[in-house]
Amino acid sequence: SAVRAAGMEGKVTLACNDLGNNVAREIASGNIAGGGAQMPYDQGVAEAKLAALALLGEETPSYVAVPAETVTHENVLEAYTDVYHVETPDWLKEAYVDNFK
């Protein structure tokens, strides 16, 4: 919105981290080029598995990283599903601009 307020739309390329609803909508409509998204569901699954292994007395790694998802205009609809493990919401499909370049 700061870019819009400054009248700089189309003159500034934006990228971001994390895929909240507002960011997803802006990527879908072409106002943000893309970014990276944490995988909260997958992070929780990894943490639960490690906790279970630790409770069973198994050795667990001291550090575990769940890879981020790269999100672009081309994959934002699928990325939303990957990140949140839900169907792509209608509001996001409606915001998607097919002919964005």
Where does each model-flagged region fall?
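Hydrophobic alpha-helical segments within soluble ligand-binding/sensing domains
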Residues: 19-23, 39-56
